Amino acid sequence: MILNSNNEFEIFREMHCKSSNHGLGESPPPQPTLPATLPVSETNWGDFGDLGYNHDLWLGKVNVSGENPMNHIPVPIDVFPEKTREYIEKTCIQLRKSPDFLAVACLVVVGTVVGKSRALQLEEGYLVFANLFACLVGMSGSGKSPALNKALAPIFENKLTPEYSYFVTHALSTAIYKEMLLNSLSKKKSSSILQLKDEMSGFFKIVNNKNGNEEKENFFSLFDGTPVHIIRTSTEFRGKLEKPIISLLGGLVNSSLHVLRDGSGEDGLIGRMLFGIPRTPPQGESMEADPELAEHWVKILKSLDSLTLDTGTKMPQPRRIMMDENAKVIYRKVVRMFNAIRDDKSIALGDSHYSILSKAVNQLGRLTLILTLLKHAEECVLSGTLIEPLGITVDGHTILDALKLLYYFHVNSFHVLHQIDYTSIQSCARELFNYCKTNGVKTIFKSAGYSSQFRPISKCTNGDSVEKLFDTIESLGLGIKTHGKSKTTTSGGRPPTFIKFIFDNLN
């Protein structure tokens, strides 16, 4: 399997450099145009060249027909080992819900159980862990809570090894939040912590609050596994925690997606999040739960939980899992692809898009590690053997499966960003439009063919209100920021999306 050396960015340039043509008086499309191009039926997942270097797939193409192609991209459950896949499929038929939520929740639970016992070495000195930050996005009744309950049933029912079980906490962020988490992580029996949120909007509001910066930095450190110092006097453990690990999982309704974005700008939170979005629920009659499959899921987690037995210290160092030569070749080509996309100066990447691309290789490593250990655990469960603590390697097939998952999450992230941006654009535009209408302002921009500097012309007594709205617009990064640098026009002299959006409706 050899990657093609195509270097095609034209479609992505179009998406990021052209302006929106939706006017204030027009109804928005039923679903925002999303950055995917091919239905799954037309995508050969087995050919790494198609998936790996097709930039239309990774970076998006505006679908002029208005159809939402992402509705045709389900979670690739074929990447799971056979019995685990059967558990996900039959459980979702029983629940009459899309498999997306349960599949994503299972990935997070596996990563939490593995915790800090194993790490994948992508390059010399570059280790990634199996923990994930994931958010299930859907309307009320779409099945977020049932999926969480099914994936976490072995934990809720205390069916894992009690001596080496990990913590599931519902604690909301407070002044002592960091202290509580790190104190739990420092305990000898703790492999990792799963921070579970049935509804994540409150959590995101707190960490994105200007007073919550410390909490957000703490979560970023716990995601990356960087050493953390505990110095507060009321904490039982004081000192340096070498490899703290935390996973994050919960649900968020579509109308609350705006809480994901910090008003001060993109800081990497969205790039660290993986989003599960439901597709069409399974058709046909519901079926009874299969106790054998449910027990298989328990055995899988027990097998993975036993990996913590061979770490054996209060602050265990992870055992490293290496890639074989085929996996290394694929990994290096994926790295080159994402580097080429990020470094192409002709592409006007927004800060959030840049964050997603920057974290793509890291997320690929995490998904690869999870699938590798999950497949190994299922083999051991079916053969009745103990999981091998040593000698596990990543093969080329597994990293390709992880790439399929990465693409699924990648597209979902762009979907979420598009919904946030579209809603924000619409809200700011209406506010500015109503302000100008109330104050008799007919022209607020001056331009020469959309190519010169855009600037507000103060024709009202309260110009500060207009300026404040512009500050809000720029803080959202709606086509005005590129790699953290403000610019008033995108490449080719075209106006930013928001500028044209209101310009066409205020003259």
Positions of predicted regions on the chain:
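Phosphate-handling catalytic cores of nucleic-acid transaction enzymes
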Residues: S27, L34-N507
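Intrinsic-disorder-associated, low-complexity terminal segments enriched in Asp/Asn/His/Tyr and depleted
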Residues: N4-N6, N21, N44-D50
